């Protein structure tokens, strides 16, 4: 009778001699073949052809068999990343990693969840100090199982591989976005810096909302929610994505806050009809600069981390730009992030609606949204208002929504939904009030439950009998009028004192921020003019001196070239530097505009 397989006395993995060589015994199973362990690994690992720019996920390396051969045969821009979710196997693997192994790093179990973020960073390293290749090195991900240790956490390894693939794909999608809009983002940033001194610091309003918060996107599901809460809207703090502003006004809802990230003037129609409306705007520092003129001083800026650059990091370290927000891709996700930041504590519920990330055939947004009204305005016999083209283009896919009916979504919208689930599914007291669209991974709350959460169940009834009853009660309340008046006066005095303090704080903030932005403008203008002179005339410098100075000036000014198709890193080639020289004049002009705004403030 065969004996029972056991680990060592402490339950740790141990190496054992088998017929074909050394294997590992752990949790009652062999992690390698008993007959030919190395041969089996070699056929699984070395038989795969690798293209340049491949990240190899070496899952559960354990004895690290064939690892040296794999690393030695790697093509250009390839790297092997050891991944181990089992703590005991991780400690065991450390003893078997070949010395001096190039292009390899082993991630511990607590580092593995951070891998997708590490793949999008300019600089990242493991906890033992091994540097990882910078973002943009990899174009694909390949998983290779080095042992049967992956069977202890099969879902974890599958999720890790998918997350790594999504991170690499997202980086290159963002690169395409930067090629298209990178210059616009940077120029908007330079101009919006001049408005910071007259804006409201976002830190001042953080954790200030005690009422339940509703976040409105512009999807179809927002209409039902808006109608349901219209009579009790004052019981909620309402945050709207920019595209949801017009539909909310149409439904009789006035939001307390609007979130904007759009960098172009296409956002202007979203604000038609806002005269006389009072709401606070939360705008990205890279958003359309004219937003400040539309909204006045009641605007809070935040900094979308649109690219991982030395320039952006230096602005953040010097406290010139507002607090940095993660790059979430969609204004609906950013609105959710801001809502969570605004609530007093985790006990304040936040509801999202209209974040459908999909739509029915014929309609793409809620009625009243700019996309809907422009379609109505341009409709004719041959081009009806119903937009069926959007649902049946070749890249769209059909899904079943939360209500069991078919919807259509695009790869971009689907990625936003996936990002939402990854960022917010574990957030406490965050609920989905939408009834249609893609599932967001949140607990569901109906509109009736929203109203119950707000503490308003019905509107007061005004009948003749009720009116008589109120008149009868008036006499009984007269003794309390003086006390209520005194309390109101005391409350007003307190508010006045708070207002004076706020005004003083705002004045100090404005003065300090204006000074720091002005210093930044002066410093950046000098550097740009110096770079312009070097590129134009050479400044009587030797070739080596000129190259070193150009490289130094470009190192912290990625905004000059990040939108180039080949602008992932700076280059000293003539064609690259000629394009940089052409960009300098744009930013010198933007600095002049910013200084003019500061001078008029």
Specify the residue positions occupied by each region the protein language model found.
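Class I S-adenosylmethionine
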Residues: 1-55, 63-69, 185-202
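SAM cofactor-binding core of SAM-dependent methyltransferases
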Residues: 58-105
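Gly/Ser/Thr-rich loops at beta-strand to alpha-helix junctions
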Residues: 59-67, 85-89, 111-113, 218-222, ...
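Acidic/Gly/His-enriched mid-domain segments of enzyme catalytic cores or analogous surface patches
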Residues: 90, 94-179, 249-345, 561-601
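Aromatic- and Gly/Pro-rich donor/ligand-binding loops
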Residues: 157-211, 222
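C-terminal catalytic or substrate-handling cores of phosphate/nucleotide-
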Residues: 285-453
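Long, compositionally biased charged/polar accessory segments in the mid-to-C-terminal portions
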Residues: 389, 393-396, 400-461, 465-467, ...
């Amino acid at each position: 009778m065969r004996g029972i397989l056991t680990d060592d006395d402490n339950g740790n993995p141990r190496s054992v001699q088998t017929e074909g060589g050394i294997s590992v015994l752990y949790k009652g199973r062999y992690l390698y073949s008993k007959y030919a362990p190395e041969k089996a690994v070699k056929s699984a690992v070395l038989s795969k052809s690798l293209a340049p720019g491949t990240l190899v996920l070496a899952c559960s390396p354990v004895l690290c068999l064939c690892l040296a051969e794999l690393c030695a045969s790697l093509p250009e821009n390839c790297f092997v990343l050891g991944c181990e979710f089992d703590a005991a196997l991780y400690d065991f693997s450390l003893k078997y990693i070949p010395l001096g192994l190039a292009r390899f790093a082993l991630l511990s179990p607590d580092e593995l969840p951070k891998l997708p973020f590490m793949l999008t960073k300019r600089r990242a390293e493991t906890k033992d100090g091994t540097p990882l290749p910078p973002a943009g090195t990899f174009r694909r991900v390949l998983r290779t199982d080095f042992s049967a240790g992956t069977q202890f956490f099969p879902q974890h390894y599958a999720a890790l591989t998918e997350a790594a693939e999504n991170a690499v794909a997202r980086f290159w999608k963002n690169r395409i976005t930067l090629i298209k809009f990178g210059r616009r983002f940077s120029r908007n940033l330079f101009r919006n810096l001049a408005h910071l001194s007259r804006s409201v610091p976002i830190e001042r309003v953080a954790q200030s909302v005690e009422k339940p918060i509703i976040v409105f996107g512009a999807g179809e599901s927002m209409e039902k929610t808006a109608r349901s809460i219209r009579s009790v809207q004052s019981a909620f703090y309402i945050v709207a994505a920019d595209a949801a502003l017009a539909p909310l006004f149409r439904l009789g809802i006035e939001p307390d806050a609007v979130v904007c990230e759009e960098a172009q003037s296409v956002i202007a129609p979203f604000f038609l009809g806002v005269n006389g409306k009072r709401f606070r705007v939360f705008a990205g520092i890279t958003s359309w600069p004219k937003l400040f003129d539309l909204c006045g001083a009641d605007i809070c800026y935040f900094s979308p981390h649109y690219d991982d650059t030395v320039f952006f990091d230096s602005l953040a370290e010097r406290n010139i730009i507002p607090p940095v927000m993660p790059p979430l891709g969609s204004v609906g996700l950013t609105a959710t992030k801001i809502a969570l930041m605004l609530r007093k504590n985790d006990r304040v519920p936040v509801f999202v609606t209209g974040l459908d990330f999909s739509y029915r055939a014929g309609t793409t947004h809620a009625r009243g949204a700019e996309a809907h009204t422009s379609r109505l305005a341009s409709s004719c016999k041959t081009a009806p208002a119903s937009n069926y083209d959007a649902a049946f283009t070749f890249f769209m896919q059909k899904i079943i929504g939360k209500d069991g009916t078919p919807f259509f979504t695009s790869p971009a919208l689907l990625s936003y939904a996936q990002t939402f689930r990854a960022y917010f599914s574990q957030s406490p007291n965050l609920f989905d009030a939408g009834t249609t669209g893609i599932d967001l991974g949140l607990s569901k709350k109906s509109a009736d439950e929203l109203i119950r959460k707000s503490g308003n169940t019905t509107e007061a009834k005004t009948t003749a009998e009720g009116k008589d009853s109120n008149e009868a009660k008036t006499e009984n309340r007269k003794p309390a009028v003086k006390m209520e008046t005194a309390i109101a006066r005391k409350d007003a005095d307190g508010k006045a004192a708070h207002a004076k303090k706020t005004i003083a704080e705002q004045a100090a903030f404005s003065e300090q921020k204006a000074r720091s932005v002005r210093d930044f403008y002066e410093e950046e203008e000098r550097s740009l003019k110096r770079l312009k002179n070097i590129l134009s005339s050479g400044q009587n410098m030797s070739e080596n001196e000129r190259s070193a100075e150009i490289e130094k000036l470009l190192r912290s000014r990625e905004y000059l070239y990040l939108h180039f198709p080949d602008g992932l890193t700076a280059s000293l080639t003539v064609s690259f530097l000629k394009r940089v020289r052409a960009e300098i004049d744009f930013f010198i002009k933007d600095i002049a505009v910013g200084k003019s705004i500061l001078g008029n403030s």
